[in-house]
Amino acid sequence: MVGLQASGKSTWVAGHLAGTHVVVSKDHWPRARHREARQQRVVAELLAEGRSVVVDNTSPSVAERAPLIAIAAAACVPVRAVFLDVPLGTCRERNDARTGAARVPLVGLHAAAGRLVAPTTAEGFTEVTVVRAVGGEGVLPQAAGPEEERGRGTAAAAIPEGSIAQTCLRPGSAAQP
């Protein structure tokens, strides 16, 4: 997942992937030291077990996404970015409506906005899906028609098997398309 705080990432994950993917987020360990390293270790372990994983973090920059892309590549699995392209103003409004620990300090929201770079396949993603807000009210509905999907970039279905454009070699194995 890629998107600012309060863009709707967790909501999107809950509605689209929670039943089929293990959700991993640094937010699961708010007080832990080395949360980034822990997250990377957990993702690598889950992928090694053959599990499907979704990382629910802001992941705003190429540099912040690179370690997870490398982990997926090492596990010979496709990696898709779902980018919630929601305006900063909308994220601020949603964040202002949050209470307690769910509310992100504005400095954090603005810092992430300053680092935000839309993901591309050039980074190593197999696919990039863009999800946009509808009238500032949330992300596009899951059941959007084909024309809406093409025109607005709604969430795509899971990556089809065999869609990896590269050959993956594991030690002691034959090439896998």
Language-model-derived ranges and their functions:
Residues 7-64:
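Conserved substrate/cofactor phosphate-moiety recognition/catalytic segment
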Residues 75-94:
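Conserved phosphate-donor/acceptor-positioning beta-strand/loop module used by diverse small-molecule
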Residues 89-177:
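Conserved GTP-binding G-domain of TRAFAC-class P-loop NTPases and closely related GTPase folds
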Residues 1:
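Hydrophobic anchor at the beta1->P-loop junction of P-loop NTPases
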Residues 29, 61, 85-90, 135-137:
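Conserved nucleotide-binding/hydrolysis micro-motifs of P-loop NTPases
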